[in-house]
């Protein structure tokens, strides 16, 4: 069956840009396949709203939702009381996520740890379904000719499907600087494409085995969408950070 596929990665709480992009490309969730490559939370302002929306999109429309490293980091910090996990999450934009759930502004320079712990407990009790949803997300999605993953695949692992979760959601240079040596094209996020070709548009590896789509929206750049048409053609779309209409695209 030939269908139009629309792929977005690294939304990072950029809820308004995400919905503006869905509207711009006229994504029809009854016909098109929407594939999301992870990192729904952290850094941006509306992580809770993004998580709620993608949960509904998967339930209602079968949208493909893949796990990213920030999603795993959030769950690890919130479901445990381990300072190392908390500090790691906070260094990577976790306070913005926390603020979207509890509407308290946390100062990263001078954290009120008792308020932080209280907020964690509240999220655990009130939003356990969010944490469970994020923790159980798949790491990869395959269709003929394409592998969709958050960070990449490890060329040093004989069968990439057996690589550890860490590679699926964290790998960088070991993946994108080397040939994959497998059939098909790997579509990935995680590494902002400006690190791959000095601008925020979708990166197409010259060898044809990789496509990087993280436009760095949470860093002030843009949110990208890769369209794989019914005929197999590739098109790229984007919304710049802050260039949005309001509301969600159903």
What do the predicted segments below correspond to?
Residues 1-53:
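N-terminal active-site segment of His-dependent metallophosphoesterases
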Residues 7, 34-36, 65-66, 147, ...:
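Residue-level marker for buried hydrophobic side chains located in beta-strands
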Residues 10, 39, 54, 68-69, ...:
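Divalent metal-coordination and catalytic microenvironments
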Residues 12-16, 42-45, 72-75, 190-197, ...:
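Active-site environment of divalent metal-dependent phosphoester hydrolases
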Residues 27-30, 60, 141-143:
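Glycine-rich phosphate-binding loop signature in dinucleotide/nucleotide-binding domains
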Residues 44-138, 175-177:
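Active-site neighborhood of divalent metal-dependent phosphoester bond hydrolases
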Residues 97, 220-224, 246-249:
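Short, charged, surface-exposed secondary-structure boundary motifs
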Residues 107-212, 216-221, 228-244:
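Acidic, His/Gly-enriched loop-helix segments that form or flank divalent-metal centers
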């Amino acid at each position: 069956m030939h269908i139009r596929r629309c792929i977005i990665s690294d939304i990072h709480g950029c809820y308004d840009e995400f919905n503006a992009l869905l509207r711009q490309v006229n994504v029809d969730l009854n016909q098109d396949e929407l594939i999301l490559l992870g990192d729904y939370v952290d850094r941006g302002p509306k992580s809770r709203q993004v998580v709620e929306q993608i949960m509904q999109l998967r339930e209602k429309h079968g949208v493909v939702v893949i796990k990213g490293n920030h999603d795993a980091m959030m769950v690890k910090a919130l479901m445990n009381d381990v300072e190392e996990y908390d500090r790691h999450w906070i260094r990577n934009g976790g306070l913005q996520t926390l603020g979207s759930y509890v509407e308290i502004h946390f100062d990263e320079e001078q954290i009120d740890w008792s308020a932080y712990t209280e907020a964690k407990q509240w999220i655990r009790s009130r939003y356990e379904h969010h944490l469970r949803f994020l923790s159980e997300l798949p790491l990869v999605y395959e269709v003929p000719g394409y592998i969709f993953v958050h960070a990449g695949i490890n060329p040093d692992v004989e069968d990439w499907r057996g690589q550890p979760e860490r590679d699926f959601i964290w790998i960088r240079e070991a993946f994108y600087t080397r040939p994959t040596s497998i059939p098909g094209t790997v579509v990935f996020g995680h590494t902002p494409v400006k690190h791959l070709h000095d601008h925020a548009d979708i990166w197409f590896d010259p060898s044809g085995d990789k496509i990087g789509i993280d436009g760095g929206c949470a860093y002030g750049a843009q949110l990208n969408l890769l369209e794989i048409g019914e005929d197999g053609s590739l098109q790229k779309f984007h919304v710049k950070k802050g260039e949005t209409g309001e509301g969600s695209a159903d």
